[in-house]
Amino acid sequence: MLLRFTKMHGLGNDFMVLDLVSQHAHIQPKHAKMWGDRHTGIGFDQLLIVEAPSNPDVDFRYRIFNSDGSEVEQCGNGARCFARFVLDKRLTAKRQIRVETKGGIIELDVRNDGQIGVNMGAPRLVPADIPFQAPEQALSYQVDVDGTPVDLAAVSMGNPHAVLRVSDINTAPVHELGPKIEHHPRFPARVNVGFLQVIDRHRAQLRVWERGAGETQACGTGACAAAVAAISQGWMDSPLLIDLPGGRLSIEWAGPGQPVLMTGPAVRVYEGQVRL
């Protein structure tokens, strides 16, 4: 059986997108792992699956698999690609699209300038909701990593994030600390790890070690989580411009209980077919 797919990226964070509205297949974690291999497969950070909604209040269901086969709750860069995909494939004519994810409902807005806005919903900061093991909620936590205390913020954007402030983004220990914090026992569902350098009150640089994918060119939910951490701790003010290795995202957040708004591009790379 051959399945049509589209290769897309959001700031270099790359995706294989499958339409399972007009095609029918049962996708398993082993398929994501096989196709995600950059040497023997298609190669991607995440596999995005477009499905018909199970909820009448939304337009589509959105599922996400990392290249290691793990299914995750949310992907911000993927959400922008999702919006571009369903419009390009004429699965909808709407430019404001409501999508059901494992992490909750998000709202997508395809703008006339080609940029795509995503209402990511309100961040969750209660430790049990992230999930993160801590006796009480705080702006910052200290985590022991190989006997060394590491200060970080913990935020859920529908998926778990740890945010560390660094003085130099170029020398940040992304590949050393990233996997250790990702698998830290205080994050029982594992965690995405962001390394944030604040430039001024409205600009920052970010690198992200993604759970199940390693360092990626960009991470939309990571940028949202970093913005929440930076604004909460008084380092920065909304709106923010966050530069990632793959490009820039605009993030707005009005404070606790309010949704995080992310704006950025989505690009189609090529169309293909893969055998299931």
Curated annotation (Swiss-Prot):
Enzyme Commission (EC) number: 5.1.1.7
Pathway(s) served: Amino-acid biosynthesis; L-lysine biosynthesis via DAP pathway; DL-2,6-diaminopimelate from LL-2,6-diaminopimelate: step 1/1
Sequence positions that bind substrate: 13, 46, 66, 76-77, 159, 192, 210-211, 220-221
GO BP, one annotated term: lysine biosynthetic process via diaminopimelate
Pfam families: DAP_epimerase
Ranges in a coiled coil: none
SUPFAM superfamilies: Diaminopimelate epimerase-like (SSF54506)
Catalytic-site annotation from UniProt: 75, 219
Keywords attached to this entry: Amino-acid biosynthesis, Cytoplasm, Isomerase, Lysine biosynthesis
UniProt site (Could be important to modulate the pK values of the two catalytic cysteine residues): 161, 210
Membrane spanning residue stretches: none
GO cellular component: cytosol
Gene Ontology terms, MF aspect: diaminopimelate epimerase activity
Annotated catalysed reactions: (2S,6S)-2,6-diaminopimelate = meso-2,6-diaminopimelate
Residues of the site described as Important for dimerization: 270
Localization per Swiss-Prot or TrEMBL: Cytoplasm
NCBIfam families: DapF
Protein purpose: Catalyzes the stereoinversion of LL-2,6-diaminopimelate (L,L-DAP) to meso-diaminopimelate (meso-DAP), a precursor of L-lysine and an essential component of the bacterial peptidoglycan.
Self-association state and partner proteins as the record states: Homodimer.
Family as reported in the entry's similarity comment: Belongs to the diaminopimelate epimerase family.
Protein name: Diaminopimelate epimerase
Species annotation: Pseudomonas fluorescens (strain Pf0-1)
Gene: dapF
